[in-house]
Design a protein with these regions (language model features):
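Nucleotide-sugar-dependent glycosyltransferase catalytic core
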Residues: 5, 33-57
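Residues in flexible loops and secondary-structure boundaries
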Residues: 8, 12-14, 35, 40, ...
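Residue-level recognition of short, structured coil/turn motifs
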Residues: 22, 67-68
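Short alpha-helical functional segments enriched in proximate histidine and acidic residues
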Residues: 62-63
């Protein structure tokens, strides 16, 4: 599913395999090597934003796909005003990584909300 960035694609794949009554074998010794090397984003704040934004969006989207998103969405929706406040306060206190963290989660929630409202 192209809506996943990275974090929940394995869960989605396993869920679809199990749905088709197939088995999944986990090999603990297996290793994967990324051909492109290191992360291309060098800016520390961008890394924080990208990681938390995509993780939050992927989590919400995965639970939406399995029709189990209502509780996750409700809990995050309650936190959004606090996240906005914390983002602003941390920005003024020059705790930029914390500010970016809360901003990324807020933005992911709004993107997810936009997606599900478009699908209604």
């Amino acid at each position: 599913d192209e809506n996943f960035f990275l974090y929940y694609s394995d869960f989605d794949l396993c869920r679809r395999i199990l749905k088709k009554k197939k088995t999944i074998i986990q090999i603990f010794e297996a290793k994967a090597q990324h051909d492109h090397g290191e992360i291309k984003v060098k800016n520390f704040l961008k890394k924080i934003f990208i990681r938390n934004y995509n993780f939050t969006f992927d989590e919400l989207y995965y639970f939406f796909k399995i029709n189990n998103h209502h509780e996750k969405t409700r809990r995050l929706k309650k936190k959004i005003p606090k996240y906005i406040t914390k983002s602003i306060i941390n920005l003024f206190l020059l705790r930029l990584s914390q500010s970016v963290y809360y901003f990324s989660k807020t933005l992911a929630f709004y993107r997810f909300n936009k997606l599900i409202n478009k699908n209604k």
